């Protein structure tokens, strides 16, 4: 676990109950933050899981940010969370398949979840921070595929590249208020489908191993530690930056054997 000293008292995390999110909220709780977890699970189930990782000094909010399109509804969510002074934007989805096989709905869902909803949430958070002179920080979770394309996830890669560009714009526009925005770009993390394929599909494991110079999947804790660093006093001079922690996966393009 990270031993950073955090610069923020209250941190909201979207996508908080996913494989990476659970390690993030646990780590931030252990570092003394009041943690606000936002996710899709209903309140009863979400609270049960949340308490396993944050037994006290935190709260769970059930919300689908892709459906909270109005300014009023987003402000209501933020009011429930007592307006955090830092937000970790972890919510995201991937739809796998070549672009020609993806429907309009697939593409729209990826862009809505990974990019559009993050923009709208950021807008409402920053309005509050400016009005209350809060020197907050937005942290966006992008991906190494922002830098090196991975076959079969073009809309996902575009959404993550867009999130990176958006973060830089937010950083530039709001630095005068003491508001910062940074990005963390993990590699192939040992959760979800990647973890399943790594363990069960020899071809995928061989292909992924060739793509990762360090030769292993990234642990969720390694992502959480990177986020803790960005929230720490050691990173207070960083804004508009991208913390790329990918085991070297972005160092070189794929060879032909790595194409699906």
Show the residue positions of the predicted features.
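Conserved glycine-rich cofactor-binding loop
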Residues: 17-18
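Substrate-binding pocket helix/loop in short-chain dehydrogenase/reductase
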Residues: 98-99, 106-111, 208
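Active-site loop-to-helix junction immediately N-terminal to the catalytic Tyr of the SDR YXXXK motif
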Residues: 102, 149-157, 169, 197, ...
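Active-site helix of classical SDR
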Residues: 122, 159, 167
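Alpha-helical segment proximal to the catalytic Tyr-Lys
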Residues: 127, 172-176, 236
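Residue(s) in the substrate-gating loop at a strand-loop-helix junction
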Residues: 143
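Short C-terminal tail/terminal secondary-structure segment
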Residues: 228, 239-260
């Amino acid at each position: 676990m990270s031993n950073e000293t955090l610069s923020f008292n209250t941190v909201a995390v979207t996508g908080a109950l996913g494989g990476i999110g659970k390690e993030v909220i646990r780590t931030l709780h252990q570092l003394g933050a009041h943690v606000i977890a936002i996710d899709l699970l209903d309140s009863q189930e979400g609270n049960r899981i949340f308490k396993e990782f944050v037994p006290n000094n935190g709260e769970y909010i059930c919300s689908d940010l892709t459906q909270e399109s109005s300014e009023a509804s987003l402000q209501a969510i933020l009011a429930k969370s007592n307006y955090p002074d830092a937000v970790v934007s972890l919510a995201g989805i991937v739809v796998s398949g070549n672009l020609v096989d993806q429907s309009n709905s697939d593409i729209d869902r990826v862009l809505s979840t990974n990019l559009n909803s993050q923009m709208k949430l950021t807008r409402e958070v920053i309005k509050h921070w400016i009005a209350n002179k809060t020197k907050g920080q937005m942290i966006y979770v992008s991906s190494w595929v922002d830098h090196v394309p991975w076959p079969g996830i073009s809309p996902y890669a575009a959404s993550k590249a867009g999130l990176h560009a958006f973060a830089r714009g937010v950083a530039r526009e709001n630095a005068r208020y003491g508001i910062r925005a940074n990005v963390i770009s993990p590699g192939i993390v040992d959760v979800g489908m990647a973890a399943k394929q790594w363990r069960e599909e020899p071809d995928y494991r061989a292909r992924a191993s060739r793509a990762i110079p360090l030769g292993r999947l990234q642990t969720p804790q390694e992502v959480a530690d990177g986020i803790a660093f960005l929230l720490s006093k050691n990173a207070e001079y960083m804004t508009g930056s991208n913390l790329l922690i990918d085991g070297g996966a972005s160092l070189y393009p794929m060879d032909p054997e790595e194409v699906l």
